[in-house]
Amino acid sequence: MIKKNPLFYSFVILILVDVIGTVFGQPKEYWTSGYKVFHEALPIFPLLQIHPLLFILVCLSIWLPFTYWLVLRIKKPINLWAAMALIIGHGYNSVFWFRVSLFQAGVFTGRDQLSMALSLVPMTVYVLFVSWVAFKSIQVYFIE
């Protein structure tokens, strides 16, 4: 399946982490206010106000298939440009939400220099992993 649309696999993990991280990265008030207090700039933020699972469901059932179709159907090299935009956009957001979630979970609560430096380790590992996946996917794209 990766050979049919390798560019999709270059950003799919980033989208999943971004969408799920958006929900889990919401402040404590989000969960106690009936979903009224939230942090999200996406135009579909009203879905977060209805229910977090609705937000996840809509994002994954509409956005994932759309991005799959987008990089499959757009002509070369524009499809590569679209994949790069998705990698950069969702990559930035997924790292942001990942870090917010770790801080909210109390994994890195210290404000000293060592705690702040150590808080970068999970993000570095994550970035290395998703960039390797993207690299391998793009490599398959150029080989085909």
Model-inferred region functions:
Residues M1-E144:
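Hydrophobic alpha-helical segments at protein termini of multi-pass membrane proteins
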